[in-house]
Amino acid sequence: EDVETIALDNVAFEVKDGEFVAIMGPSGCGKSTLLNILGLLDNPTSGTYLLGDCDVSQLRERDRTNVRKGEIGFVFQSFNLIDELTVAENIELPLTYLNMKAGERKERVQQIMKRMAISHRAHHFPHQLSGGQQQRVAIARAVVFGPKLILADEPTGNLDSKNGAEVMQLLTELNQEGTTIVMVTHNEHDALMAQRTIRLFDGKIVEE
């Protein structure tokens, strides 16, 4: 007999344009499921998800993919860089999906590498970088195409405190420039950098 597991139960909240929101809660409470739905990697079985004015929960798969590639940037705990590509190539990757001319792609990559203080690593491969440098590359890749929304899943989880603080500073600066950020974290100190915190427990919001 199949037993239905409810990962998220009547979760309702609004993130305003330009806000920085942290999501906290114990392992297994639904944080990753929520982030996957926000990132259009999973579909909710019921309910709606409005991204701007569009109910993206009703889109066809191809349209969802286009929205994801054009409007949402992802930052992961494990960086998720492609080992065979250089730093510059990793950062350029999202731009190749947007029919952007090569010259403009290169210029954008140069600008964001300078911003993230990794220009001197442009031709290095991920395994030649420290954890902090890899996360800077991952953030550069996430923002290079100017997404409306950044989803960060434990962005400092694999970093020491110094590199973690630098990554949080970068995210805070991006938010101050107008980027909307939703961040899942176990770290209370990181959560304090957000404007508000949503706490999940057993698939429900217990505090907002």
Residue ranges and their predicted role:
Residues 1-197:
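ABC family nucleotide-binding domain
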Residues 197-208:
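H-loop (His-switch) and adjacent beta-strand-loop-beta switch element
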